[in-house]
Amino acid sequence: MVREKVKVSTRTLQWKCVESRRDSKRLYYGRFILSPLMKGQADTIGIAMRRALLGEIEGTCITRAKSENIPHDYSNIVGIQESVHEILMNLNEIVLRSNLYGTRNALICVQGPGYITARDIILPPSVEIIDNTQHIATLTEPIDLCIGLKIERNRGYSLKMSNNFEDRSYPIDAVFMPVQNANHSIHSYGNGNEKQEILFLEIWTNGSLTPKEALHEASRNLINLFIPFLHVEEETFYLENNQHQVTLPLFPFHNRLVNLRKKKKELAFQYIFIDQLELPPRIYNCLKKSNIHTLLDLLNNSQEDLIKIEHFHIEDVKKILDILEKK
């Protein structure tokens, strides 16, 4: 474990790792500071960074297992101590590190009796196991067990969907989250208008990334999210009559509207009321207040006209078009 005294600079904004330790192969801890910050900045950065650490960093997981020995995922196999469900749960907990993109195959092929651990997984070159001792199954008899695995890199959660299992393939709930937890706290110092803040960030990871690596990746991902705002074309913004106006992108509204008119007769639009479209209540009420009662009324409005409706959002245009195209 490494500890250092906290020194606060009153000049340049700096970050520093003040504590770092490895509690086990699958649990790393890091504590970082960023200072000096103006009042309110620490909370802004802390909230954004925590969300990026927990939701924007990619991880690698086993997402599917396949074996001819397995009739269904709640069965028991003669010669194996664990149920199939328990084996799938153990595979779910295997911690992997990779730089792969897409899906890769891996394999377990073992002859009993004996213990099956993560060490027995035959991996593609781009993937490594963090803890080879992680338990998978116990073979109590001299049987052969072969399990094909699918490995993916992603972020967030991937919950297994219902499957007919006809190919003896079983999806596994995946948690693509190398950061297990992240907290931030704030220390204020100074008086009055001179008050400044220190941001403390605590990060726990599963060992596939160090806390420092996670901090760097989360920072890069946050920067990438904001980059589009730095390249907004000036000609899309203009002032008129002392009001801020924005020229909206066409969206695919115009093209999709043309396609709709080709598919359906315009006369029919006149007799289809918006009550029949099963619109969300908020969108329905906005349209009714603007005297839009039929589908023809709706389609005679441009995207810009719709956006001017009070409480109507640009996302609502897409939602309406999606509903219309299904009709």
From Swiss-Prot:
Keyword Transferase among UniProt keywords: yes
Gene Ontology BP annotations: DNA-templated transcription
Function: DNA-dependent RNA polymerase catalyzes the transcription of DNA into RNA using the four ribonucleoside triphosphates as substrates.
Gene (name only): rpoA
Keywords: Chloroplast, DNA-directed RNA polymerase, Nucleotidyltransferase, Plastid, Transcription, Transferase
Gene Ontology annotations for the cellular component aspect, listed alphabetically: chloroplast; DNA-directed RNA polymerase complex; mitochondrion
Self-association state and partner proteins as the record states: In plastids the minimal PEP RNA polymerase catalytic core is composed of four subunits: alpha, beta, beta', and beta''. When a (nuclear-encoded) sigma factor is associated with the core the holoenzyme is formed, which can initiate transcription.
Entry note about domains: The N-terminal domain is essential for RNAP assembly and basal transcription, whereas the C-terminal domain is involved in interaction with transcriptional regulators and with upstream promoter elements.
Name by which UniProt lists this protein: DNA-directed RNA polymerase subunit alpha
Family: Belongs to the RNA polymerase alpha chain family.
Location in the cell: Plastid, Chloroplast
Region (Alpha C-terminal domain (alpha-CTD)): 267-327
Organism (species): Nasturtium officinale (Watercress)
A GO molecular-function descriptor: DNA binding
Region annotated Alpha N-terminal domain (alpha-NTD), chain positions: 1-233
Catalysed reactions listed for this entry: RNA(n) + a ribonucleoside 5'-triphosphate = RNA(n+1) + diphosphate
SUPFAM superfamilies documented for this protein: C-terminal domain of RNA polymerase alpha subunit, Insert subdomain of RNA polymerase alpha subunit, RBP11-like subunits of RNA polymerase
E.C. numbers: 2.7.7.6
